[in-house]
């Protein structure tokens, strides 16, 4: 059973017990995709367990303050849906690369991540960090044009955020972040353009304080599955220059947002009853429990939208037999006969 789960005795690698399994490494085994996937799941489990016990120690010491952690964009190392279960409030570090591409494209990407952060716990989040001017770690750290800081802060609030905070307040004089942007720069005055724009954000937040505690109602749910992303990133074929999972998600997301439709970004544990539309971009990996939810959703009148490279493998990354797409996406009444990879 262990060998089957790791890839059907691939190249004579038969496992007779769990004691024989080593973690993926440059001096170990890297070709068993199921093993690589389980290792990433294990890392998330260990991190969530660590957070759980750290918070427990604080609670035993008498602290009742809410807990949070600085999450980061679409970080590939941890499944944030599992991490979010251990903390009270979701917050994330928001560093979009404004002015490197069309502003609207950057806004869509940043907006989708806001919606992910809101959806992790289904309640308001915090923009924990944002740069008032320019960072010092991006390949080209472009200065925010006048008004962009205000627009970025209001975007966070519009997507269900309850705070627009900064890193950093006062610019360091030395060390690695001395050129990272701040509310108060090396000049030190309060008469700079940036300081005035930060003040404008603060005054506006006071004016709209009644929005605190409100929620965003979405009729559309879009699946973001870390397991599928990990498995596709590890895949050898059909395209080894990247399968572009997040780009596929953004194509769906742009379509909804252009119509003014709010989107929740969900995982496979989420209930689907309140949604009218379910979007499944590149749902490479199907888990049977979620398959039953989708079947019920469609049978009760919900609209299902999916894409290419869906319903390919089970949760051990073993390919389904008898054709793809497998599972509820077969409601499309389509079957993939061949796969053509584009350049």
Model-derived regions: residue spans:
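Polysaccharide-binding and catalytic clefts of secreted carbohydrate-active enzymes
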Residues: 1-112
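Single conserved hydrophobic/aromatic residue that forms the stacking wall/gate
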Residues: 1-10, 333, 337-343
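Carbohydrate-binding surfaces of carbohydrate-active enzymes
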Residues: 13, 17-18, 52, 64, ...
């Amino acid at each position: 059973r262990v060998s089957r789960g790791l890839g059907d005795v691939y190249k004579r690698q038969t496992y007779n017990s769990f004691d024989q399994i080593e973690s993926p490494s440059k001096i170990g085994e890297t070709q068993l995709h199921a093993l690589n996937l389980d290792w990433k799941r294990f890392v998330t489990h260990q991190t969530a367990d660590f957070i759980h016990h750290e918070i427990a120690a604080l609670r035993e010491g008498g602290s009742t303050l809410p807990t949070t952690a600085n999450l980061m964009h679409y970080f590939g190392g941890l499944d944030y849906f599992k991490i979010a279960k251990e903390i009270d409030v979701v917050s994330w570090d928001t560093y979009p690369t404004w002015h490197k591409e069309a502003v609207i494209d950057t806004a869509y990407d940043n907006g989708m991540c806001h919606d992910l952060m809101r959806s992790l716990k289904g309640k308001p989040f915090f923009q924990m960090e944002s740069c008032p001017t320019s960072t010092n770690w991006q390949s080209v750290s472009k200065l925010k044009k006048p008004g962009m800081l205000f627009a970025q802060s209001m975007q966070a609030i519009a997507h269900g955020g309850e705070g627009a905070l900064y890193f950093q307040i006062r610019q360091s004089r030395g060390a690695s972040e001395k050129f990272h942007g701040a509310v108060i720069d090396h000049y030190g005055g309060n008469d700079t353009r940036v300081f005035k724009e930060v003040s404008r954000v603060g005054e506006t937040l006071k004016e709209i304080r009644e929005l605190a505690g409100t929620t965003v109602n979405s009729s559309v749910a879009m699946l973001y599955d870390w397991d599928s992303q990990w498995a596709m990133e590890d895949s050898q074929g059909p395209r080894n220059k990247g399968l572009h999972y997040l780009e596929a998600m953004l194509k769906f997301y742009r379509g909804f947002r252009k119509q003014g439709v709010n989107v929740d970004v969900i995982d496979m544990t989420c209930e689907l009853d309140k949604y009218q539309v379910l979007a499944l971009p590149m749902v490479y990996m199907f888990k049977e429990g979620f398959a039953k939810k989708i079947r019920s959703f469609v049978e009760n009148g919900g609209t299902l939208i999916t894409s290419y490279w869906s319903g390919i493998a089970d949760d051990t990354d073993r390919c389904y037999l008898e054709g793809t797409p497998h599972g509820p996406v077969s409601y499309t009444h389509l079957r993939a006969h061949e796969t053509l990879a584009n350049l």
